[in-house]
Amino acid sequence: MHLVSTVVAALVVAATWAVPVAGAQDCGALWVERNTYYKQAGYCFRTQQAIEYFGNAGCYIYNEAQIQFAPHIRRRLQDIIRMERALRCPR
């Protein structure tokens, strides 16, 4: 089961990477990119929207503060959050 969720997460990431970062400047694309990093890390989503989009199969982290992102991913997440605020995206 963990293998299936890993494969699904990899496919989502690959699809996200296919969109140039500069082009991912709308709220929906930023939401998907941001939450893809959380899915990859094993986060268990709580919102219905995220559960429907990503699912919770294979998740094992319930507290997002416990996620240990690599520095480059942490920086990208900070950039995404800044862009979401600038665009006034819903959270």
Where are these regions (language model features)?
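Positively charged n-region of N-terminal signal peptides that target proteins for export
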Residues: 1-6
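C-terminal segment of classical bacterial N-terminal signal peptides
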Residues: 7-8, 13-21
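Amphipathic alpha-helical packing elements
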Residues: 29-55, 59
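Enrichment for repetitive, rod-forming helical segments
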Residues: 9, 41, 81-83
